[in-house]
Amino acid sequence: MTEVKITEGDLHPRDARFAIVASRFNEFVVNALIKGSLDCLDRHGVDKNAIEIIKVPGAYEIPLAVSKLARTKRVDGIIAVGAVIRGATSHFDYISGECARGLSEIQSQE
């Protein structure tokens, strides 16, 4: 049986800079997501001095902040975290949908 070739990206970035864009709304959930993101970056060898956290009011504002930050090219990777909790209104669908759409658009831009 022949071996299958496996190709992976470098999971231990050296000299890379990262930003975490996080919403302030629902901070009790978002703070745990930030902590998990920081832990993941640490486990992959990212220097703590190479990480910045940018807070925005809510999930709706995340795509705009990510877009502006990406255009500066001062970071190599951006992690976006926010929490929208489903309630009795359509607010959840609207906000989470717009956030996902905005991030998808940014991701497809060069």
Q: Model segments located where?
A:
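Short alpha-helical scaffold segments that flank and stabilize functional sites
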Residues: 39-40, 68-69, 110
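Glycine-rich phosphate/diphosphate-binding loop of Rossmann-like nucleotide-binding domains
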Residues: 8-57
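Arginine/glycine-rich "motif VI" loop of SF2 helicases in the C-terminal RecA-like domain
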Residues: 43-46, 104-110
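Short gly/ser/thr-rich secondary-structure transition/capping motifs
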Residues: 1-5
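Short coil/turn connectors at secondary-structure junctions
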Residues: 15-16, 48-49, 73-76, 109-110
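A generic local secondary-structure boundary/capping motif
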Residues: 6-10, 103-106
